[in-house]
């Protein structure tokens, strides 16, 4: 899918390294810079791919995901906002509406090291169908040798949220994640609280855990691709570790049957409590990603 994105015809050359393209129904922004290749969908301000020069793709994007208006994209970095997980009210979209609506590219800046982009979503008749509040939501990205994401929300309300990042791995059976802390809510086991005794999360089967006292950096050890991905978290309360495992993967129409084998989600989240946003104090949720050889 990522190769397909970079082979799409250019609709508009925004700058020497930025172009607008289209995949099925969705407008994309493609970054082709000497230090980095990356792509975004305007729907959801969704980072689809990020590949620093000399590295393998860092993010995973499903080859089966549709690029349709209003349909969530499977992979990359979905922005879950203003709620994380199932909606409290029946009939509303899981993980909020921010990932399903078109955003605006507000600004971009390029230098020798990479590209910075800011996307914006504000209240509209469409958002009021889901949520009554006025808001301005900004998604700031800096892509180069590292990837930095900052979700900034303005208004008067409370939210839960996550940067639901899908990381590309060689073989989930040879992946471990450290730095998650010990206490977690096990969403596969009736949301019971449990403890990770050795500090190392592996993914033998379906895993869906909300960690309650994570460190500020999670480390993904990928034995098959012989690399380490360091995931920094800022302004967060939780880190979520997720992989659907074989049975759920087969049931998901936007994922290959064996899709679970080549990704792991390590998510920067504010999920176990609400985050308060006021006019005097906007809220942030931020993630930084670095890659290194093992």
Model-found features: residue ranges?
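Beta-strand-rich recognition/accessory modules
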Residues: 1-34, 43, 127, 136, ...
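Short acidic/polar mixed-charge low-complexity motifs
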Residues: 34-37, 46, 55-58, 133-135, ...
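Acidic-aromatic substrate-binding/catalytic surfaces of carbohydrate-active enzymes
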Residues: 34-93
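Short, well-ordered beta-strand segments enriched in hydrophobic/aromatic residues
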Residues: 38-40, 141, 147-155
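Short, hydrophobic/aromatic beta-strand segments
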Residues: 49-51, 156-164
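Beta-strand/loop-rich accessory regions of lumenal/periplasmic or secreted enzymes
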Residues: 70-99, 178-191, 215-218
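Extended, loop-rich substrate-binding clefts of extracytoplasmic carbohydrate-active enzymes
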Residues: 92-144
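Active-site/ligand-binding surface loops and adjacent short beta/alpha elements
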Residues: 158, 166-240
């Amino acid at each position: 899918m990522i190769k397909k994105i970079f082979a799409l015809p250019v609709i508009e050359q925004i700058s020497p390294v930025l172009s607008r393209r289209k995949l099925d129904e969705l407008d994309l922004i493609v970054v082709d810079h000497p230090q980095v290749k990356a792509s975004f969908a305007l729907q959801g301000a969704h980072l689809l791919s990020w590949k620093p020069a000399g590295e393998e793709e860092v993010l995973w994007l499903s080859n089966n995901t549709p690029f349709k208006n209003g349909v969530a994209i499977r992979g990359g970095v979905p922005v879950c906002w203003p709620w994380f997980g199932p909606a409290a009210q029946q009939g509303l979209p899981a993980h909020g509406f921010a990932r399903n609506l078109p955003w605006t590219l507000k600004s971009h800046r390029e230098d020798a090291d990479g590209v910075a982009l800011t996307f914006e979503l504000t209240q509209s008749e469409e958002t009021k169908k889901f949520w009554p509040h006025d808001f301005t939501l900004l998604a700031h990205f800096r892509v180069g040798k590292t990837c930095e994401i900052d979700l900034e929300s303005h208004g008067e309300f409370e939210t839960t949220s996550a940067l639901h990042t899908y990381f590309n791995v060689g073989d989930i059976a040879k992946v471990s994640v450290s730095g998650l802390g010990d206490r977690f809510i096990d969403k596969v086991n009736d949301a019971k609280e449990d403890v990770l005794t050795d500090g190392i999360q592996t993914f033998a089967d379906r895993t869906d855990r909300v960690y309650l006292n994570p460190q500020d950096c999670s480390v993904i050890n990928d034995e098959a691709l012989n690399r380490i991905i360091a995931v920094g978290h800022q302004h967060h309360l939780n880190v979520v570790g997720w992989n659907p495992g074989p049975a759920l993967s087969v049931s998901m129409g936007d994922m290959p049957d064996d899709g679970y084998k080549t990704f792991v989600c390590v998510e920067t989240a504010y999920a176990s409590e609400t985050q308060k946003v006021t006019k005097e104090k906007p809220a942030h949720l931020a993630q930084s990603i670095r890659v290194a050889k093992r």
